[in-house]
Curated annotation (Swiss-Prot):
Function of the molecule: Part of the high-affinity ATP-driven potassium transport (or Kdp) system, which catalyzes the hydrolysis of ATP coupled with the electrogenic transport of potassium into the cytoplasm. This subunit binds the extracellular potassium ions and delivers the ions to the membrane domain of KdpB through an intramembrane tunnel.
Pfam families hit by this protein: KdpA
Keywords from the named record: Cell membrane, Ion transport, Membrane, Potassium, Potassium transport, Transmembrane, Transmembrane helix, Transport
Source organism per UniProt: Clostridium botulinum (strain Eklund 17B / Type B)
Name of this chain's protein: Potassium-transporting ATPase potassium-binding subunit
PANTHER family documented for this protein: POTASSIUM-TRANSPORTING ATPASE A CHAIN, POTASSIUM-TRANSPORTING ATPASE POTASSIUM-BINDING SUBUNIT
A GO cellular component annotation in the UniProt record: plasma membrane
Subcellular location: Cell membrane
Designated gene of the protein: kdpA
GO molecular function, one term: P-type potassium transmembrane transporter activity
The keyword Ion transport appears for this protein: yes
Membrane topology classification: Multi-pass membrane protein
Regions that span the bilayer: 2-22, 66-86, 135-155, 177-197, 260-280, 292-312, 391-411, 437-457, 490-510, 546-566
Amino acid sequence: MMNLVLQYGLYILILVVLAIPLGNYIGKIMNGEKVFLSKILTPCENFIYKILHIDKDEDMSWKKYSFSVLAFSIISLIVLFLLHIFQGFLPLNPEKVSGTSWDLAFNNAISFVTNTNWQGYSGESSLSYFTQMMGLTVQNFVSAAVGISVLFALIRGFIRVKQKGIGNFWIDITRTVLYILIPLSIVVSLALVSQGVVQNFKQYETVSLLEPITLEDGTLVTEEVVPLGPAASQIAIKQLGTNGGGFMGTNSAHPIENPTILSNLFEMISLLLIPVALCFTFGRNIKDRRQGIAIFVAMGIMLVVAMAIVGVNEQIGTPQMALNGQVDLSTINQAGGNMEGKEARFGIATSSTWATFTTAASNGSVNSMHDSYTPIGGMIPMLLMQLGEVVFGGVGCGLYGMIGFAILAVFMAGLMVGRTPEYLGKKIEPFEMKMAVLVCLATPIAILIGSGIASILPETVNSLNNSGAHGFSEVLYAYTSAGGNNGSAFAGFAANTPFINISIGLSMIFARFVPMMGTLAIAGSMVKKKKVAESVGTLPTHNAMFIGLLIFVVLLIGALSFFPALALGPIAEFFQMLG
């Protein structure tokens, strides 16, 4: 257990040390201030504005900003859909991969445009290098930038007084990609290449096995095909942008995507780096760092508790494992605990940390198979997604989702003391409350409706590899992942079918854009308001009491929404294992 504590402490320390300066840097980018990269990138930025006829002085209303977000996303979806369909005719396809089915193309286009990266296929066998690079990798950049841009708009809504505009979407997305995502991705890509992650355009290589194996039918296998490709560049942004879609089917459990313990560290820190940094950006730009720290602490407390629960449950294992008497013991030669579905080179601590990080953020990349976790160890990642991906969450969307919960929290507090609620010096009125409820409830609606329909359809039930509580957990996890814009999976059933592809695709669209539009509506309403002077009756939103209230509201909504479903899935499985 000491190993768990030390590793957890190290990961969090590195994360915070890197996130604070990055948060200040991102704050400067939002405000258009000069940074150390300005001399290099400003000419590129101005060139983009010129060729696209972008008016740098335009300040958009929330409705125009929303229209721009939707228009950009729709165009991205159409282009990515067509890339999937026609990839067999496009270049950089050394393995001669044909186009995908229309329903898989529909699902995957939505998946990457919404920053979910749910994958019902294996990339190395289903997609060409061109589709991976020009389709998926491009969307990894711009879908992440869309989320950050919407957060910028919301922050402006709080800091501006009696205005109409909340910024310019085209400027926000351009600056986010140019100044934040590309530089960070270059650094992480080079770090990954140094550890052996592949980055080339070669054909797949056939190599001889060190130990030939005999299949059940008696066939002797002496060779294996090793997939190659431009993986490192895609992996870097899949982590930094909380995208999560793997170049390979097994994601970062694959030794070509994640070969060493150092590559694992780089990828895991990258996963939460920007979501954590944005908390400090928020505090800096509203000119009250305590507000950003309060939200960071609330998120951090929930993250650490989740890490502890997953780590302890995976180290202890199941009651059946405990009959061994030794399986939970960690020694210098073995990780102990529940090692099913985990890479021996990573062990319990690193695998459980990644599982917690990737579901706290709306990332979804994996270095172990969540379906093989213990019932409670698998339930916590599911619950983190069901809370609305607000425990840091995706880049931009996690923080604006948590701000939605903060608005609910101050409203509840205002009801208790009989005052009009205020947040960051502005009154919270009925319109903001309606939009905040929309932001907070979109995820539960998408998850529960989708999983409920799928669970009663014979084609889903018949395709399950596991029956009973665990089978239901697999379906619930799939729609939780889609509704949380996460993208990870328990797997365990046929995911690449027309119904699953379409229904999960619709869940991803709903869960991405409904909260986003609600957030922009809040920004548009707030930007018109004047600041209200603090008084003795004003609820402080930066102290321990508010942090506790915020955590309570997040958990209350999550518990009320999902406890019945969790009781039928992982909780029932836990008690079944107890005998």
